[in-house]
Amino acid sequence: MWNPDFFEEHGYCIIDDAISESGVAEIRNTINRLCDENLLKKAGIGKEGSFELDQTKRGDSIFWINPLEAQGGTKEYLDFMSEIIISLNREFYMGVRDYECHYTRYPVGTRYMMHSDKHKHTSHRIVSFVFYLNENWTEEDGGTLRVYTEGNNFFDVLPKAGRLIIFKSEMLHEVLITNRIRESITGWMLDEQRLF
């Protein structure tokens, strides 16, 4: 359940069963179709001149979502996120004006090293969100999201189907090595409108 007070105090909130099981399955099927059609692209680190592809640092492949074309489970999820955005703006005057997100797939043996989603190339990201699609996920499957809090403490989030984590984009986090294919929708709320 979305808890704005918890988010304000801790900088994050975890919501289980954010959308219907059928919606989760539809999104998973969409990612599998994109993979079969070779439309998922290897993700890199940095922008323009500093862009690099390095599977040891970041191993996922992605496909950007156009919200205007979203259907089925993806639309159900984006509608849910729109309600969260309304809540954040109403409760905390956060100034969220837009969002961007992509389908994400990590092959077995990959990870994403510790990083922050907000830096000089992405300064307009204010809140990050990850929605997981992985059925019957266990700790032995790896692929945990580790989020760092003050004092170098951290908490781990198991990427099980239907789970959504929302957290402030400046928080350091990493994806630990996954022992199964790991799928999600990953995105960011922005304090400016995107230019297509």
Say what each PLM segment does:
Residues 1-90:
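Non-heme Fe(II)/2-oxoglutarate
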Residues 12, 98-100, 109, 126-130, ...:
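Extracellular structured ligand-interaction cores
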Residues 23-25, 108-112, 174-175, 194-196:
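Short catalytic/ligand-binding loop motif for oxyanion handling, primarily in non-cytosolic enzymes
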Residues 90-96, 118-123:
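Short, conserved, surface-exposed binding loops centered on an aromatic residue
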Residues 94-102, 141:
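A short coil-to-beta-strand element that immediately follows conserved catalytic motifs
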Residues 103-122:
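Conserved short histidine dyad/triad with adjacent acidic residue
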Residues 119-120, 125, 134-196:
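Catalytic core of Fe(II)/2-oxoglutarate
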